[in-house]
Amino acid sequence: MGMAHALGLEGAAPELVDLMYRTPLLQPSDLVYLGVDLSRETTDWERGQAAEHRIAVVDQTALCDDPRGAAADARRILASGPFLVHLDVDVLDFLDAPIAENVNGRNSGPTIAILGQALGALLQDPDRWGLSIGQLDPAHASADRTAI
């Protein structure tokens, strides 16, 4: 779980946990996973940590069924005030958007159109301070110049 360091979980690298002005950087209530399929995309340890720390999840089915509604649900879970959106491209269906670092998501995950609807809802929120994107590998789509 990449968030282990920000949450200061046991086993996280101290040099990453102590990197910022407060330790841990995030509390579990500061985090909502939107569009995650816990049964496919996570390890037993990650699922255990998410359950133990009660990290909120608006799952992949909810996102695919109603992208804007799922985004609104995720936003309601967070406290009012500023928030950031982090997009891990690995959640996308790799066949629809071959831009992920991890190529195992073939025919699984939301399409780029579904993701766009959810992101549109979140990015229009006046309390949204920023967007970060991770796991993007344009080389995987080098034959398709329209992929990005």
Where do the PLM segments sit?
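Conserved alpha-helical scaffold segments that buttress catalytic/binding sites
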Residues: M1-I148
